[in-house]
């Protein structure tokens, strides 16, 4: 009887590993075909503005802010694996940090402390010009990542153009990113 019970428990464990949930974006699981995911995203109020190869681009509202959303899928378009949110560019460091801190706080309240976080500012001054210069040089680092059920969520401040930056949020479904890498 103990052996039978052990086998049942082991089978349940194996099945639960295979039944891992997919990460979701705005309530839409990040899986399935590009066509189906894009249709669901459109139903959430996003407007498709273009696509190329295995990436579709949308404009819309993300938590009350205008954003551009990129959806990534396998080369054949059969499986979506990631969603990236791009907020408007800014030449103001304070705007970038406020947006970053706002979303970092939201994700920390929802998922707990980030699994990884690096916020490095080599400039000892709070000068917009110096901080934007450092961002352009790649010496300022603001990024945080959470390991969540089904994948990872990352937020960062990225260089955008000559003297601008933008806040970027990346949703990556663990199973589908791994499957895409194996191809």
What are these regions (language model features)?
Residues 10, 62, 74-76, 135-137, ...:
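Sterically constrained small-residue positions within well-ordered secondary structures
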Residues 60-105:
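Mid-chain, structured segments of secreted extracytoplasmic proteins
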Residues 24, 29-34, 53-76:
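Accessory recognition modules or surfaces
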Residues 20-53, 88-183:
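Non-cytosolic coordination micro-motifs
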Residues 4-15:
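Sec-dependent N-terminal signal peptides
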């Amino acid at each position: 009887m103990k052996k039978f019970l052990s086998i049942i428990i082991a089978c349940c464990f194996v099945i639960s590993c295979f039944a891992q949930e997919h990460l979701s974006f705005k309530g839409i699981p990040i899986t399935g075909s590009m066509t189906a995911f894009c249709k669901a995203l459109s139903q959430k109020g996003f407007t498709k503005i273009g696509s190329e190869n295995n990436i579709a681009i949308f404009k819309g509202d993300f938590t009350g802010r205008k954003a551009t959303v990129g959806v990534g899928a396998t080369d054949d378009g059969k499986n979506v694996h990631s969603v990236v949110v791009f907020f408007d560019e800014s030449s103001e460091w304070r705007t970038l940090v406020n947006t970053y801190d706002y979303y970092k706080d939201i994700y920390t309240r929802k998922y707990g402390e980030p699994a990884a976080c690096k916020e490095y500012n080599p400039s000892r001054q709070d000068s917009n010009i110096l901080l934007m210069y450092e961002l352009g040089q790649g010496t300022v680092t603001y990024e945080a990542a959470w390991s969540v059920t089904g994948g990872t969520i990352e937020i960062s401040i990225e260089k955008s153009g000559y003297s601008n930056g933008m806040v970027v949020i990346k949703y990556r479904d663990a199973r589908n990113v791994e499957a895409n890498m194996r191809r």
